[in-house]
Amino acid sequence: MRYYTQVVAASLVATLAVVDSIVFADRGNKLRFLRQDGATVTRGGKGEERTGTAGSVESLTNLANLYFDSNLSSRVIKKMLEEHDGHQPVLAMIEKRFQERGAQKYMYLDEGLVTRETAEKKFIEWILEGKTKKQVKKEFGISSEPGNESAVELQESAIKAYGDWLEDLNGRSWDLENTAASKAFAYLYGKHVSRDWILGMFKAWATEGTPLKVAKNHLFKEPMRPFDMFQEENFVAYVTYAKMLREKIKSISPPRRDPVPTASN
């Protein structure tokens, strides 16, 4: 399931009295939102201001919860809420929900049972390392034993979620490489840049051995939750550089030589 494009299912849409579909531009990424009747929005062209007032805190709360349950990131929900007057208490409520979700016990790692946010931070690391779902399952899968059913179920759910992240990332990468490669592969220095342009920069970085942390600081201007980072439009570029850097390091590493068997061993 693709998180960044996920739109509320028909059964959830029915919870809204009247639905008006609008498009909110997030640095070139078109994200489709739904709003309940009672909210008014002034729409403008590129570069124009948009303002809005919510009919009630209740309707805005319903929308925020709807987006939260639809796996939209906290940054996207915040941008939506900030278009409406009286959004502060709703924003505080949603922030609390994100904190509670991030604190849920989610997965067993080397250090034991960890929270969702800790596990998702690990998801980011695995993606940058190029780990497949199969590799993660081999490393962190829990064997089924009597009395161990709940742990197995929890672990399988987390590993499946990692697989969903990979599936989503592959879809986004394909879209950028095949539909927006010429103009909007990433957002840097206040503008969208092409895939060819950024690959040229990445090639120079990889040749110089520029650390991944430097690329991260260029692509993401502020700290954010792992899930929010994953949904950022620059994440595909981040993963692209990580892959280029891995390949460069591999190409200059001396070949592995197994020890020559001797009589003593």
Swiss-Prot record:
Gene that specifies this protein: RXLR146
Keywords of this entry: Glycoprotein, Host cytoplasm, Host nucleus, Secreted, Signal, Virulence
GO CC terms in record: extracellular region; host cell cytoplasm; host cell nucleus
Motif (RxLR-dEER): 32-50
Record-annotated disulphide pairs: none
Compartments, as annotated in UniProt: Secreted; Host nucleus; Host cytoplasm
Leader sequence segment: 1-25
Protein name per the record: Secreted RxLR effector protein 146
Domain of life the protein comes from: Eukaryota
Glycosylation sites: 71, 148
Membrane-traversing stretches: none
Family recorded in the similarity comment: Belongs to the RxLR effector family.
Main function: Secreted effector that completely suppresses the host cell death induced by cell death-inducing proteins.
Lineage of origin: Eukaryota, Sar, Stramenopiles, Oomycota, Peronosporales
UniProt comment concerning the protein's domains: The RxLR-dEER motif acts to carry the protein into the host cell cytoplasm through binding to cell surface phosphatidylinositol-3-phosphate.
